[in-house]
């Protein structure tokens, strides 16, 4: 299962946990915690929450 498929199967609660303790690289974007690893590639959690509310993560490179 790819990372994209796994994210697609997450519930809202699971998806909101992304970046809480770890960072995931998804198609060149970094989802990180408040420490940040590469701030130029961070996806704001508000954008993640918005995507989760639509039950869809669309990550553009």
Curated annotation (Swiss-Prot):
UniProt note: pH dependence:
Optimum pH is 5.0.
Q: Which UniProt keywords apply?
A: Glycoprotein, Glycosidase, Hydrolase
The UniProt note on how this protein's activity is regulated states:
Inhibited by Hg(2+) and D-glucono-1,5-lactone.
* Residues that coordinate or bind D-glucose: 33
- Origin, by domain of life? Eukaryota
The entry lists its GO molecular-function terms as: hydrolase activity, acting on glycosyl bonds
Tissues/organs with expression: Expressed in petioles and leaves, but not in fruits.
Active-site residues, as the UniProt record annotates them: 33
Enzyme Commission numbers on file: 3.2.1.186
What is the catalytic activity of this protein?
Answer: protodioscin + H2O = 26-deglucoprotodioscin + D-glucose
Mind telling me how this protein is modified after translation?
Glycosylated.
Family assignment? Belongs to the glycosyl hydrolase 3 family.
The entry describes its oligomerization and partners as: Monomer.
Q: What does this protein do?
A: Beta-glucosidase highly specific for the cleavage of C-26-bound glucose moiety of furostanol glycosides torvosides A and H. Hydrolyzes only p-nitrophenyl-beta-glucoside, but not p-nitrophenyl-beta-D-fucoside, p-nitrophenyl-beta-L-fucoside, p-nitrophenyl-beta-D-xyloside, p-nitrophenyl-beta-D-galactoside, p-nitrophenyl-beta-D-NAc-glucosamine, p-nitrophenyl-beta-D-mannoside or any of the p-nitrophenyl-alpha-glycosides tested.
The identity of this protein, by name, is: Furostanol glycoside 26-O-beta-glucosidase
Origin organism is Solanum torvum
């Amino acid at each position: 299962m790819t990372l994209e498929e796994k994210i697609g199967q997450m519930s809202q609660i699971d998806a909101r946990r992304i970046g809480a303790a770890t960072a995931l690289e998804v198609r060149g974007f970094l989802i990180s915690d408040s420490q940040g690893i590469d701030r130029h590639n961070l996806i704001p959690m508000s954008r993640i929450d918005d995507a989760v509310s639509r039950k869809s993560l669309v990550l553009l490179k």
